[in-house]
Amino acid sequence: KRLKSGLTNLLSNKDITIFDGEASFINKNEISIKNRNKVIKISSNNIIISTGSKPFFPDNLKPNNKRIVDSDYVLNSKELPSSICILGGGYIGIEFAYLYNSFGVDVTIVESTNSILGFVDNEIVNELRKNYLKNGIKILESTKINEIDEKDDSISISFSNVNDQVDLNFDLLLLSTGRIPNTDNLELKNTKVKTDNFGFIKVDNKYLTNIDNIYAIGDVIGGSMLAHKASEEGSKVIEGIINPDIIKEDFIVPACIYCQP
């Protein structure tokens, strides 16, 4: 709340008008903003989509905020579980594994592919894996969930890989299975903006969609889902709108995983 309030004040001081609500496209120049029983329509020569992303969940596995939870739930939780199974060995799963382990929680990471952090250099992954195992974090790679039995006081999970099958009990199952773009409620069909099979908006090297006045930046276009990347992309878009002849320069996006080491 403090961060949101600070950003709101910063934008307001720059004479930027803020509308609270859910926006959707009417056409390529006009959007509708719904806030409770009120609907506002605004139009613009240029529109930038930066609606971010949300957690992705497998079709047969959804959070219920009881024994099966997502990252939003655990960040707002006031109690620590005694044990947790983290499904997904990407950025989010690795960071939460470190966090819970630091608080003394028994942590198990389950990754369906043959390696956690599959997008990171092997040398880094091997060092991190060695450190996690040393600190008591269990890592199950090339492993899939077969069956879940949710009880009042625990959750029983059946796992399997090419060599073995095992049943384990946990207090919580944290789903950290990736993120998908927030595009499903934008009514993009009213603009004919193109997306890929996952809903990510397609853009060119100036972040322009296939529609000549609609741009997209940040998580909604895929790639590295980082706030500072989206901020830089936003600056590039504004520069391009002001000066259409500007040449886009590629930039390297620094990233880190919040854990030790």
Region locations from a protein language model:
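FAD-site-proximal beta/loop scaffold in flavoenzymes
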Residues: 64-80, 168-241, 247
